[in-house]
Amino acid sequence: MSLTPAQIEVRRTGVGASEVAAALGLSPYMTSLALYQVKRGEAPAPEENLPMRYGTHVEPFVLGEFARVHPTFAIVPTPDTMRRGPMLCHLDAWMPREATVQVKTARTRHGWGESQSADVPMHHLLQVQSEMLLADVRVAWVPVLFGGADYDEFVVEADRELQDMIESGVHDFWQRVQRGDPPEPVTVDDAVARWGRASITDRVMADADTLQAIETMRNLREQRAQLEQAEEAANALVLRALGERDTLVDQRGAVLATWKASAPPQRFDTTAFRAAHPALAAEFTKPGEPSRRFILKEQRA
């Protein structure tokens, strides 16, 4: 659903149901550290992308389809904010004192189970369990539009043990936010976001796990170099087969590869512009953010 400005402000004061997976380190889209930085105001909230806008656009249609399939359900759309400590949610719809409704869209059925089952992707499961906890209901309906044309429904029952774990985990995460105690980085982006702007001149003794990671990186880089060489040799063979012609086909006429001329790119000559218009260039030149460069040293003989 699309949040109102007031709801967005409220969301800054806690963890929304759709953010629970990130708070617990189980989101495929955002790490705990990334969410922590958003809640602390150290990083902007993720920009709305095309799939998110599409989901917002078709949500009324999916809700309408859900109402058509269940004409006896007393569906109330977009109820007000529900809250319990740092946990909060803005439901797509619900049947008061009976069930929540969480609309989803997906390109494919990958990660989804049988129709009417509770087999939904983990981050969605954590979301609807959180919503059921806040709404104090025992059932969550999840109507889904797959690929823009395939409607289906899933039904998830409340799991009190899982809800307790969610509530405890969100509480711990929010305590970190309030204390200014960031979660440990788990991705390269996390590490860069936390430590990538400045460094101090000092040395750290590598432990056994770090030494193993260094060895793994060296091995992988060597394998990558070998694969790149093999790919380049294969590429050269294919280009020789094409010669001046632009399309390679198999015996059935199916296109295997193309090598076509493209329009020459237009590039802005920064050096020439700076020489011709130094004052204007200076006016529109801004210093970049400081950053650190990681270098993996070659193994000594």
Segments and roles (model prediction):
Residues M1-A301:
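Accessory terminal regions of nucleic-acid processing enzymes
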